[in-house]
A protein has these predicted regions:
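Subset of outer-membrane beta-barrel
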Residues: 1-253
Length: 253
């Protein structure tokens, strides 16, 4: 759905162990210019035991990452939209740090009378500005080419979506190139309540232990609208390893 007003959102993800992720974002529209946005993302990986070459514990160290994002979006006509993000990324591990710059580019085409939406994006175009060690080789950013489509059904309060990720990565054959996909469904149960279900094929493969995957890759969540506020919760299963909890709140200022 297209953004209206001045949307502001905060989200928090409780990952495995002591890993936590928080995101704060805001955007506003300038007449005849376009929509500008800003966001901050922070990941804390918790604390780790530090040891010498003989395995003797000498203390603790932490690891964290931050991303500062500035975005712009506009429309070419009533159906075709484009946007871009510029990101400054900081990563710190113990007393070492690294920085990077990256750009995201995206296109969105909507057919409102048919309830179709199509998207294309190239994520993380860029590279390191500084390295953890001056003598080490520069690390590549996780470049990702994404194609997606969604459809709101006419006779059911249901929106279906399909996204393909990492289309830029080399695979053994043509079919393998499309193995990183996600499927989603959003049921509008009432004006204030939505139910969401999803499946991540790549995540299911990654968290398969032996021949057992459990419910890894399956997601469930709900959205509740109270007055001018939207509250969202989601759970993503990582199979036998555990799961992720996502909490979000958004409004328009």
């Amino acid at each position: 759905e297209l953004l209206q007003g001045n949307p502001t959102s905060f989200s928090f993800v409780k990952h495995l162990m002591d890993i936590n992720l928080a995101t704060l974002s805001y955007s506003t529209e300038f007449e005849n210019i376009g929509r500008f946005g800003a966001a901050v993302k922070y990941i804390n990986y918790g604390s780790f035991d530090e040891a010498d070459d003989f395995g003797n514990r000498t203390g603790e160290f932490g690891a964290n990452e931050m991303a500062f994002i500035i975005g712009y979006a506009n429309n070419l006509d009533e159906n075709f939209y484009y946007g871009a993000n510029a990101k400054f990324i900081y990563s710190g591990i113990a007393d070492r740090s690294s920085t990077a710059m990256a750009v995201d580019l995206g296109l969105h085409y909507a057919i409102p009378d048919k309830n179709w939406n199509f998207g294309f994006a190239v994520l993380n175009l860029g590279g390191q500005l500084s390295k953890y060690y001056e003598t080490s080789e520069a690390e590549d950013l996780p470049l990702d080419v994404v194609v997606g489509v969604s459809k709101r059904l006419e006779n059911l309060p249901l929106r279906l979506s399909l996204d393909f990720h990492k289309l830029n990565e080399d695979r053994d054959d043509f079919i393998e190139r499309f193995k990183a996909f996600t499927v989603g469904a959003e049921f509008t149960l009432s004006k204030v309540l939505k139910l969401r279900l999803g499946y991540d094929n790549e995540r299911r493969s990654e968290f398969k232990i032996g021949s057992t995957a459990g419910v890894a890759g399956f997601n469930a969540g709900l959205g509740v609208k109270v007055s001018d506020y939207q509250f969202d919760y989601g759970y993503s299963s990582l199979g036998l390893v555990g799961g992720l909890h996502r909490i979000g709140i958004s409004t328009s200022l």
